[in-house]
Structures are given as structure tokens and as C-alpha cells.
Amino acid sequence: FIGPIISALASLFG
């Protein structure tokens, strides 16, 4: 699945 949510989660994870 391709979504910007991954980018957001990545930011939270650091």
C-alpha cells in the first residue's frame, strides 16, 4: 500500500 502515512509515521519514529 502506498500512502503519505508512512512518511508521517517515520517522522514519529524518528
UniProtKB/Swiss-Prot annotation:
Main location (coarse class): secreted
Glycine amide modification, residue list: 14
GO biological process: defense response to bacterium
Subcellular location: Secreted
Swiss-Prot/TrEMBL keywords: Amidation, Amphibian defense peptide, Antibiotic, Antimicrobial, Secreted
Distribution of this protein across tissues and organs: Expressed by the skin glands.
GO cellular component, one term: extracellular region
Family of this protein: Belongs to the frog skin active peptide (FSAP) family. Temporin subfamily.
Task performed by this protein: Antimicrobial peptide. Active against the Gram-positive bacterium S.aureus (MIC>60 uM) and the Gram-negative bacterium E.coli (MIC>60 uM).
This protein's name: Temporin-1DYa
Species of provenance: Rana dybowskii
